[in-house]
UniProtKB/Swiss-Prot annotation:
Pathway membership, UniProt: Amino-acid biosynthesis; L-histidine biosynthesis; L-histidine from 5-phospho-alpha-D-ribose 1-diphosphate: step 1/9
Biological process, per Gene Ontology: histidyl-tRNA aminoacylation; L-histidine biosynthetic process
Entry GO terms, CC: cytoplasm
A Pfam family of this chain: tRNA-synt_His
Domain of life: Bacteria
Protein name: ATP phosphoribosyltransferase regulatory subunit
Amino acid sequence: MALQPAAGAKDLNPRQVETNRQLTERLASVYRLWGYDEVSPPRVERLATLMAGGAIDSSDIVRLVADDPLGLRPEMTASIARAACTRFADRQRPLRLWASGTVFRTRSADEGGQCIEENLQSGVELFGVSGSEAEMELLSLLMASVQTLGLQTSQKPRLLLGHTALMDLVLRPFNGAVRDQIRTALIDFDRLAIESFDLAYAEKTRLLSLMDCRGTPDQVLAQLSSLYGEQPVFDELRRLCTHLASAAQAQAVTIQLDPTFQPHFELYTGLVFQLVCDGRSSPVVFARGGRYDDLVRRCGATDDRAFGAGFSLAIDPIRELISDLDAAEQQQSDVLIAFSTASNLESAMERQRSWHEQGRTAVMALEPLSSMQEAELQAKAQGGLQLDWVDP
């Protein structure tokens, strides 16, 4: 029986690897323009760090058999926050960092047992900014990243915004286990669960209406103001969405506000967001982020520095969404250098060197071929390569 990769692991072909590299390099060039410095957090971390003080469930973490409780990172934010609060504690704030790398998560496989999901991510983290100016910079940077990726209007990119303060307003009348159950039902968009709770009719009706309360920021904030009166978070969101409107419109990104939108990771303590596109068969989340001040505080930051926010982009889904990654590079085919029986490998390799000096990819047919027609067939079989036939 042929050996197979572990469930959830991926064997990428050369084209996929090259596309991933181009995507990460494009994003890196944008991050650098905004003053972000690259870091490389470890793949292996202590479970205490990976669980982000309880914000990330241990069942999401791939554990390692070791003397110390170690695991593979399910995301990079916690590791970067730890480094920012220890190794980079003396650096000037705001501290701007970016990283790319593989993350690992576990889930239950359809046939039972555990499945390891392996994904490539690229993202940024901004530390030391307490106000909404951090979110304004990050979302502007996200729009610049979308621009360099070249998403199509037909993919209908949508930026979904939420805020923990909005969810707190919704959950304010409830306490204890009921509050947690309602929060889970709202996040999962589980109307049946809401209807099954032992709540007053008016409370059920309000919760069900809030599940449908998503749309343009102006519309949603007007509806929330009628329910809860004016709140400081409303002004913060208005300012943010007004600032973001022109950049989002330029990239054909629709902004939606949803008071019940929250990630399952209880990592965030302010604004949360996701960028979603229409995939081939279903919507695809390819960017997510938000503010995580509590995590920075757990990592040891003093109260005057315990501020952090960031986002990550999922490279693998982006690769599948984008078909025309780099038309300029695709217009030039790689070169196949083939030589006849009347020539020799040494002469062909001299020709190869001249192509390399021009910056072109050129590969060798290492054995002589009987005719140019045979060489043309080989070039076609290898993906339509341009033929350089060496025949004295």
